[in-house]
């Protein structure tokens, strides 16, 4: 089996297990229960979770999604679903695991009969949400932080067209610089996953920094590109938030975001969560090079990337740079 296909299969299995929180196969009793279970209409609600009260956060890793989602999750009546990887589960398979010609094939499970399998994705998400949040408050909002599943953003938004979407953007040069620091031999990601790096299942940025920078730029283009595609196609409530604007005027940007999304929020409470999660309130021993909270300084890539690395990132991500940051393109 080709290495690429093998890696895709491994990712899909890991994603499914992580999403469903199971390690064993389905039992005979469970199979019988599933047979007896009535088929639920794809548009019905899951417990107290209303599809129109779901807010997705798509974009890229290292773009401030943890910060943004933490603030949103602290608002009364909001619940945070942190990285279910459901976008990665379906997106990796649909866009990377099979040839595009399969998408219109009559017998392919995610082929010609689109309404059927899109409806199944819808039920899959809502059933998962109901299982994970059994006591979800009536009228509450579910915030789904899914930057690393952005490759599946078009499928997620098609399955739940009533839901709302935040497209969180950050200069790809800063994203790559942050990723390189995290995956260097002294970085937090390396320390947390050291065995995977030593076994070769993850690549350290210290091994070949130039190749790593270009590779991360390609991943940014793929994931952020799909997130932008979903954003452009979505006909419901949506908002583009730039990390740089969030840093410069956090409270003002949060107010604009909630207003555009049509989500009511108490301004005093919003000010409280903004202050609570501010960069200044993060303990100093948790900030700095090699740590999860590194710089929070837009434009810091100028100090972190070599001219060659910056050029490579700009070349690879040029389509998105021109569209999202036209003022930064020479």
Label every PLM stretch briefly.
Residues 2-127:
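PAPS-dependent sulfotransferase catalytic core
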Residues 290-305:
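Short helix/strand-capping connector loops at secondary-structure junctions
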Residues 70, 74-154, 159, 185-211, ...:
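PAPS-dependent sulfation machinery
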Residues 89, 273-280:
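Post-kinase regulatory C-tail/linker adjacent to protein kinase catalytic domains
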Residues 56, 67, 164, 249, ...:
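Amphipathic alpha-helical recognition patches that constitute DNA-binding helices
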Residues 78, 263-265, 326:
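Helix N-cap/coil-helix junction residues
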Residues 95, 99, 140-268, 279-283, ...:
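PAPS-dependent sulfotransferase catalytic domain
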Residues 304-330:
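C-terminal accessory extensions appended to soluble enzyme cores
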